[in-house]
């Protein structure tokens, strides 16, 4: 493994250097073998005797851990200085193919930015983040991922006493909108410029020599954010806490906390029980994405003219709608756009809202429909079967215009409509067993989530509607 730390070497004063605080009797609970292989890691690194590498007791050569400082808007209100309160950027892994990945250890102990926290993470939240990153990655949504989950005998006090844990998160970058806000609101505009130049140099090197590099860069940040959120909306993912300090400059989904996937199609779903006003509801995410980009634009106002910032921001909605429309047409089995496609989509979504239909299962079942069937077996899932039959007939006539075989259409539709997603109750079942040192449920769920688009009878039980108790789970920011 080859590591360095360009953040440390190139950005003086943007962080505090310190070492992780190891946990009591730490042990490696689980890891992603697939990600380890992609990173070129020897499987022997995950033997019990090497737990120190994943628990902060031992640093690999070239690692220089540090805590980053940033600020942000939380629930629409300026929160001031935040920063890595329990996580450390260990270093950047350099792969032979030129790719670079941050290694970030979460739950690594107190930092100067811990505020009132204890610097620790609990097993419950680390497993939720691990599973979320894996699920989103295999759904094709840009995301951070987690390599390892470490548990311990160290008690951590939240609503109850829980096991202290650590998560090793891997991402191309951990730069957030809030990094730029921090220095802007401190009046350190030269550091805003320095940070922008750093990000462009390392992640947009093709723009370094461009005269309008800041405009071109910010425009791409806007577009990436739009595409990320379009992906969220297409798979029914609600992030839960879209504060500006949780927004990636690369358009990656990260900082998984009180997230959730739609069960019943409820556009107003609020998955964070601390979000009393519904600011971060599922249907509000596209709007919040733009609001957050406006906050970033404000922080970058010293780098571009107001006209340039408006020009970049103006690209958000068209790109969001283009990408979302493309994904939703694919979910309906439509290759080429037609003028009535939006009516077909809204007709189905309205019917699903009225009926309380399961979002993931409804689209997956539609993928299996045969276009010569005058009546779909899906109708039995609906109370108002006449309304469904009416919609189905319109959809069927539209699909026939595509002039594709059932087999071809079904295959492409299945690639747009997962058979299973990470429902909260599935994660909870895996967590409860893992807390008893039984990782069998976790491992099985992880394997299933790596094949979300497959017809996999062995995982059919994971693709069902949640039981009643599973619909009533509440998730908070507590982690």
UniProtKB/Swiss-Prot annotation:
GO terms for molecular function: AMPylase activity; ATP binding; magnesium ion binding. It is an enzyme of class 2 (transferase). ATP binds at residues 83, 85-86, 106, 118-119, 169, 176, 255. Keywords: ATP-binding, Magnesium, Manganese, Metal-binding, Nucleotide-binding, Nucleotidyltransferase, Transferase. The active site is at residue 245. Its cofactor is Mg(2+); Mn(2+). InterPro entries: SelO. Mg(2+) binds at residues 246, 255. It catalyses: L-seryl-[protein] + ATP = 3-O-(5'-adenylyl)-L-seryl-[protein] + diphosphate; L-threonyl-[protein] + ATP = 3-O-(5'-adenylyl)-L-threonyl-[protein] + diphosphate; L-tyrosyl-[protein] + ATP = O-(5'-adenylyl)-L-tyrosyl-[protein] + diphosphate; L-histidyl-[protein] + UTP = N(tele)-(5'-uridylyl)-L-histidyl-[protein] + diphosphate. Its EC number is 2.7.7.-, 2.7.7.108. Belongs to the SELO family. Nucleotidyltransferase involved in the post-translational modification of proteins. It can catalyze the addition of adenosine monophosphate (AMP) or uridine monophosphate (UMP) to a protein, resulting in modifications known as AMPylation and UMPylation. This is Protein nucleotidyltransferase YdiU. It comes from Erwinia tasmaniensis (strain DSM 17950 / CFBP 7177 / CIP 109463 / NCPPB 4357 / Et1/99). The gene is ydiU.
């Amino acid at each position: 493994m080859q590591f360095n730390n360009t953040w440390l070497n190139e950005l003086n004063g943007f962080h505090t250097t310190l070492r992780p605080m190891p946990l009591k009797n730490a042990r490696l609970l689980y890891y992603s073998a697939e990600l380890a292989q992609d990173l070129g890691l020897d499987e022997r690194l995950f033997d019990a005797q090497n737990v120190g590498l994943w628990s902060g007791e031992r640093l690999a050569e070239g690692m220089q851990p540090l805590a980053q400082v940033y600020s942000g808007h939380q629930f629409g209100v300026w929160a001031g200085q935040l920063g890595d309160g329990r996580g450390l950027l260990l270093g950047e892994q350099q792969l032979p193919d030129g790719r670079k990945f941050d290694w970030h250890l979460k739950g690594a102990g107190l930092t100067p930015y811990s505020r009132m926290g204890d610097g620790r993470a609990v097993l419950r939240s680390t497993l939720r983040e691990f599973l979320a990153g894996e699920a989103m990655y295999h759904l094709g949504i840009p995301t951070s991922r987690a390599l390892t989950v470490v548990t311990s005998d160290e008690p951590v006090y939240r609503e109850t006493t829980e096991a202290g844990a650590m998560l090793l998160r891997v991402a191309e970058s951990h730069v957030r909108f809030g990094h730029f806000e921090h220095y802007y609101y401190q009046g350190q505009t030269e550091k805003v410029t320095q940070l922008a130049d750093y990000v462009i140099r390392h992640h947009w090197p093709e723009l370094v020599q461009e005269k309008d590099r800041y405009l071109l860069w910010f425009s791409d940040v806007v577009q990436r954010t739009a595409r990320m959120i379009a992906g969220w909306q297409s798979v029914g993912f609600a992030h839960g806490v879209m504060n500006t300090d949780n927004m990636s400059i690369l358009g990656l989904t990260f900082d998984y906390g009180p997230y959730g996937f739609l069960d019943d199609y409820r556009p107003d779903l609020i998955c964070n029980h601390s979000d009393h006003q519904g600011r971060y509801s599922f249907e509000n995410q596209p709007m919040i994405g733009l609001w957050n980009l406006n906050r970033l634009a404000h922080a970058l106002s010293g780098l571009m003219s107001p006209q340039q910032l408006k020009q970049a921001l103006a690209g958000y909605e068209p790109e969001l709608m283009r990408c979302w429309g493309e994904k939703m047409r694919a979910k309906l089995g439509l290759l080429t756009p037609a003028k009535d496609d939006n009516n077909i989509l809204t007709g189905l979504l309205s019917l699903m809202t009225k009926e309380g239909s399961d979002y993931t299962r409804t689209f997956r079942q539609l993928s299996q429909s045969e276009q010569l069937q005058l009546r779909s077996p899906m109708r039995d899932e609906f109370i108002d079967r006449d309304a469904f039959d009416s919609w189905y007939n319109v959809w069927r006539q539209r699909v026939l215009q595509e002039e594709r075989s059932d087999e071809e259409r079904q295959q492409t539709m299945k690639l747009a409509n997962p058979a299973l997603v990470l429902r909260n109750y599935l994660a909870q079942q895996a967590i409860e067993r893992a807390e008893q040192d039984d990782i069998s449920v976790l491992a099985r769920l992880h394997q299933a989530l790596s094949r979300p688009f497959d017809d996999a009878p062995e995982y059919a039980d994971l693709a069902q509607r949640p039981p009643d108790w599973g619909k009533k789970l509440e998730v908070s920011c507590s982690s």
